[in-house]
Amino acid sequence: MFQIFVDSAANLPAVIAKKYNINVISFVNLISGKEVTCYNPDLTPEEEREKGKEYYDAMRKGCEIKTGLISTATFEEKFQEALDADQDVLYFSLSKNISGNFNSARLAAEELSDHNTNGHKIRLIDSLNASLAQGILAIYASIMRDKGMSVDEAADFLEPLVGKMNGVF
């Protein structure tokens, strides 16, 4: 078995992340100096839409917005939880051409691999995309996992598809 991770840039609604058992690691942004978590698994779809509207309304009003990077320590913590649960890890990142998240996850994976992964694997896939194009990869991985595929089988199948996906905004 393996656990699937995405960052909140995948824009997976909480109900979809829960349905497909996908772990979402949230960005934390600053809006006019106030920390705002980008993902909350407890929000209803209506609350998620309202939170998104508030974010873009703040942007339109000229509020100072700073995006954050998910720390290597956060990735280590989340990946370690999966390893401790006797599972492999598969992470789909926001494009490394947009964010440093892939590198943070890579450093975390290297740190964990240098110690003890209990024989489990950590696979990282740069989606080379953003938004739901990133999330769709995780949904496909979930379906493959449910069919009994290993982390390597799922990752090896999905990684070549990265270059064939386009995000439309």
Predicted regions, residues:
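Short Gly/Thr/Asp-enriched flexible loops that form oxyanion-binding sites at enzyme active sites
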Residues: 94-115, 136-138
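Short glycine-rich or small-residue beta-strand-to-loop segments that form or flank ligand, phosphate
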Residues: 88-96, 123-126, 140
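Internal, active-site/partner-interface "lid" segment
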Residues: 142-169
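Short helix-capping segments at alpha-helix termini
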Residues: 111-120, 147
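A short helix-to-beta-strand connector/capping loop
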Residues: 19-21, 118-121
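Glycine-rich phosphate-binding/hydrolytic loop that grips phosphoryl groups
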Residues: 128-146
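N-terminal glycine-rich anion-binding loop in soluble enzyme alpha/beta folds
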Residues: 3-74
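Glycine-rich phosphate/diphosphate-binding loops that line cofactor/substrate pockets in enzymes
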Residues: 76-89
